[in-house]
């Protein structure tokens, strides 16, 4: 069971780095690991669970990995200290390089949940995927479609339960 005070502090830490880069999602499908920057997310309570919604575009390498995963971690990094690593993850595709190796960031594994995270992160949300919904032209307003999806590179909305927080 999550401690609500800890959840409040962790969410507050997260919003201190947004909308500037500083939030990395680490996915692992058992054969591949990948880091991707996250700019759009929501925290809340759904199905009597503390949850986070993340949005991943279909064109992203992490899309395939997340669709074959049960868990992921959200890692809050201090942008001032890790700007080069964050920029690498934002500007490079995991199809073309091993972003974890190239960034020099260290992978940590929770011995109980086996969820991997970034050791250097100031806050980590360990998450279990509950639901995936594809956004498309039929479920978006015309305004949103024109502004964010004119090339039809839609997001998948992934709802995940927050299992654990490390700070």
Regions found by a protein language model. Name each.
Residues 1-37, 42-167:
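Active-site-proximal mixed secondary-structure blocks
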């Amino acid at each position: 069971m999550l401690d609500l005070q800890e959840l409040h502090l962790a969410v507050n830490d997260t919003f201190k780095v947004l909308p500037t880069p500083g939030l990395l999602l680490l996915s692992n499908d058992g054969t591949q690991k990948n880091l991707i920057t996250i700019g759009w997310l929501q925290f809340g309570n759904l199905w009597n669970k503390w949850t986070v919604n993340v949005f991943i575009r279909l064109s992203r390498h992490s899309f395939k990995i997340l669709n074959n995963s049960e868990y992921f971690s959200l890692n809050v990094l201090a942008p001032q200290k890790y700007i080069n690593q964050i920029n690498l993850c934002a500007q490079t595709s995991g199809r073309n390089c091993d972003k974890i190796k190239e960034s020099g960031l260290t992978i940590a594994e929770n011995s109980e949940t086996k969820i991997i995270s970034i050791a250097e992160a100031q806050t980590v949300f360990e998450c279990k995927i509950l639901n995936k919904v594809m956004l498309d032209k039929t479920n978006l307003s015309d305004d949103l479609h024109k502004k964010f999806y004119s090339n039809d590179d839609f997001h998948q909305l992934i709802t995940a339960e927050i299992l654990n927080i490390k700070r």
